Amino acid sequence: VYESRVGDVITLGTSTWQIQEITRDRVVVVPAPGRTARLPFWHGDQDGRDYGFGLAQGRLTRELSQGLHRREPAKNGDQNTAQTVLEAQFNRETAQRLERDGLDHNAISNLAKLLDEQCEATGTIPSDRDLVVERCRDEGGDWRIIIHSPYGRRVHEPWALAITTRIKQRFGFDGQVYAVDDGIVLRLPDGYGDLPTRELLLFDVDELQRIVETQVGESVLYMARFRECAARSLFLPRTRPGKRVPLWQQRLKAAQLLNAARTCKNFPLLLETARECLQDVYDLPALRTIMTGLHAGTILLSE
C-alpha cells in the first residue's frame, strides 16, 4: 500500500482492481476488468540495472541489429505459399559471434525474430545510441508514451521524477510515470497524447539536477529509505527487545518521525536519506551524460 498511488491497477486473486482512495486504515478499490495490472509485491525492491551494464546491453543490441537481415517478401510473390516471407536472420559474422557466445541455432533464430519484430513495431531498435518513443492508447482510452531505453532503473527513476514534475508544472495535472530497467512509461489523460516529446523528456542538465534534488524528498523512495535509515540509527526502538516489529508499525513510526524531523533543518537522518537516494540509488552523473548526449545529437531520440 505504501508504494501504491490512487489510479494504480493491481491484480489480487483472479481479478484486477483500480485504487480509488487510500486512507489511514483501508484501500478503496473498484473492479477494473481487462485492465493491465501489476501484482502486489511481497518483498523489498531489487536494485535496478547498473548504467554500465545497460550501456553494454544497448551496445550489443546495436551491433546485432547492424548484422540483421530483416524479413522480406519472397521473389516469387506467391501469396499462397508458406515461403512468401523470408525469416529474419543474422549475417554470417554475427551468427558466428553468437555461436561462440553459446547460443544454438534456435536461440539465434529467435533473437533475430525478436529484433525484427521490434524494428517492425517502432521503426528503430533501441540501443545505447538510439532511444525510441512510442505512443499508444491503453485499454481505458488514455494515452501511454513509452520511452524504450536500455540504461536501467538507476538512470530512469530520477528521469521519471523530473518528467513527473515538469508535467505538473507546465500542464497542470499529475501524470503517472513509471520507471523500469528497460525504459519509462507515461500515462496521460485523453487529449494530452500529442504533447511534444522533446519538451517532455529533455532537460538542461543543471535544471535536471536541481529538480531531482528538490523533489526526491517527496518520493516514495525517500519515505522507504528514511525508514531504513531511522531503523539503522536506532531512532525506531523495539518495544519488546528480541521481537520482530511488524513492517506496518515501522512505517507508521517512521512517518511520524519524518514529519517531526522536517521541522529541523539539516537533521542528520534527512541528510543521510537524501544522500542515499541521490548517490546510492540514483545515478545522476550517468543521467547528466545521457542528457548531454541527447542535446548534442550523439544519442538520438526517435519517434
Regions found by a protein language model. Name each.
Residues 23-40:
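Short, solvent-exposed secondary-structure boundary/capping segments
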Residues 1:
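A contiguous, basic/glycine-rich beta-loop/short-helix subdomain that forms a polymer-engagement track
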